[in-house]
Amino acid sequence: LNVSNCPYLKDYSVLKEFSNLKSLNISYNEPEHFTFLKELNHLESLSMEQTGFKDMSLLNNLGDLKELNVSKNRLKNLEKFVNVEHLESVDAKFCQLTEINFLKNARQLKHLNLFTNRIKDIRILKDAKDMVYLNVGRNDIKDITCLKEMKQLEIISLENNNVKDLTPLKELTNLCDVDLYNNVIEDLTPLEHLEFISYLRLDHNAITDLTPLSKLKYLRSLTLKANYITDVTPLKDLELLEALRLDDNPIQDTSVLESMEFYEKFTN
């Protein structure tokens, strides 16, 4: 049932009669209250983006819940939301979260979006080994050790954090889309064997040596703006590269790239 973007709909109490409802989207509405959720204990998918929802304890009757979107809300009582065992997808971006301990037992998570919060510690995710998509961009994360067991991970965004050590990524060979924009990264060596990466964003770091990227033969898009790169020779054999940004680097010579098929598209 999709009743999103219906701002004049305030009373949802009638939904209590639909106890077998499997999917509900009330995003971008402003319900007077959310107590009706307690009766919808067969819900598998629930979207409440920007609704004013706060009290996560109201979801504890939803034992079948697999997909949850509570983005753009100021959540509270996170510690009282314990029915998370079946969750596969959680969107909680722009929620001003400072911790995510409520996800401790969410071991079936495949999709997690925590973009733009205030999170420093993501160690609680160490058992989410089936994760395919993870966005923790725009937080305050330094330690990504917990990611090393996420062998299924394909897409990750760590942009705008304080990550320096990429070692936990070195065996995540399914990665194809990696966003590391605006961190404090110096060493790219952990990426050198992640051969299926096709999109890589590394702008605004402290990178000097591109040698580890020379083996990423499937790279199609690479952005390296605002680093400390002087030598781009390691990129010369990346034959599939279609987009390359090298602005704001002290590069001495780009002539080695002139033989590349898409050279005319590149900006340096």
Give the residues covered by each predicted segment:
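Concave beta-strand-loop units of leucine-rich repeat
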Residues: L1-K10, V14, N20-E32, H42-K54, ...
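Acidic, Mg2+-coordinating catalytic modules of nucleic-acid enzymes
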Residues: L37
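Conserved catalytic-core motifs of eukaryotic protein kinase domains, centered on the activation segment
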Residues: L257
